[in-house]
């Protein structure tokens, strides 16, 4: 069989850079023991990955999703949100707790924009040091 080139795969994945990312990810999967979907023909893993993409034995969208999942550090789990009625009910029942268990509320001073700007203008810049 002829060697796989980028031109064989560019019909399946439009962006060459994305093709390189997908093929390299698939080659890593193969080297980690993933099952290949075509005959190896004594080819190396990157060539096998490109041939799988060219022969459409793997979906580029599935590869892309798997690549994104492998790069994620924190995976969000979709959990059903509470409806407004149960939230309000929870607040009403929590209001009957002892006052000793309730945390103290923190009060903040309110400041207008003019007061904030006047305070910023009144700041003195620090003297230059050799730390920079």
Swiss-Prot record:
Its EC number is 2.7.7.6. Residues 76-105 are annotated as: Disordered. This is DNA-directed RNA polymerase subunit omega. It is an enzyme of class 2 (transferase). InterPro entries: DNA-dir_RNA_pol_omega, Pol_omega/Rpo6/RPB6, RPB6/omega-like_sf. PANTHER family: DNA-DIRECTED RNA POLYMERASE SUBUNIT OMEGA (PTHR34476:SF1). It comes from Allorhizobium ampelinum (strain ATCC BAA-846 / DSM 112012 / S4). Keywords: DNA-directed RNA polymerase, Nucleotidyltransferase, Transcription, Transferase.
